[in-house]
């Protein structure tokens, strides 16, 4: 049987305990920050809820979607949804929560995009009546995809 002894002053023991407590506090604080903001829960199960949500962001759209389709995500995100999820995370959504599930995509014609020369659409992805993701797509020569926030300016 081995017995190991170490001689430490009380001051050294206190320093070690303080460092340990500081590291534990830092770990718990970082963990709490990472999980402190739950994803937004935005009701989008009905056409009226979807249009009202878009209107709350400043968008005016036609009263019916021009396209509705089902999208089934894989068990893990792969391209193009992996890159698309970066856009979603920037606006508070996260498609990884919906891996393995089927989402409905509703596409609306945007009627008030600031640059009226660009035809634009709003895509909303809904799962179980809750908004899972969304984007604004402007097509044409200089087309692009952006988040749902109304452009400033």
Tell what function each PLM region has.
Residues 4, 33-47:
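Ser/Thr/Pro/Gly-rich low-complexity linker/stalk segments immediately outside membranes or between
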Residues 1-10:
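N-terminal Lys/Arg-rich, disordered targeting/topogenic segments
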């Amino acid at each position: 049987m081995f017995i190991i002894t170490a001689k430490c002053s009380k001051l050294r023991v206190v320093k070690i305990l303080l460092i340990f407590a500081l590291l534990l506090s830092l770990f718990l604080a970082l963990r709490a920050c990472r999980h402190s903001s739950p994803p937004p829960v935005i009701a989008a199960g009905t056409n009226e809820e979807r249009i009202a949500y878009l209107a709350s962001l400043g968008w005016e759209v036609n009263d019916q979607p021009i396209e509705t389709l089902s999208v089934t995500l894989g068990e893990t995100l792969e391209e193009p949804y992996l890159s698309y999820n970066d856009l979603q995370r920037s606006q508070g959504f996260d498609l990884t929560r919906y891996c393995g599930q089927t989402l409905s995509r509703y596409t609306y014609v945007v009627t008030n995009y600031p640059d009226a020369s660009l035809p634009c659409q709003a895509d909303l992805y809904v799962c179980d009546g809750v908004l899972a993701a969304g984007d604004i797509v402007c097509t044409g020569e200089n087309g692009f995809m952006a988040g749902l926030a109304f452009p400033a300016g």
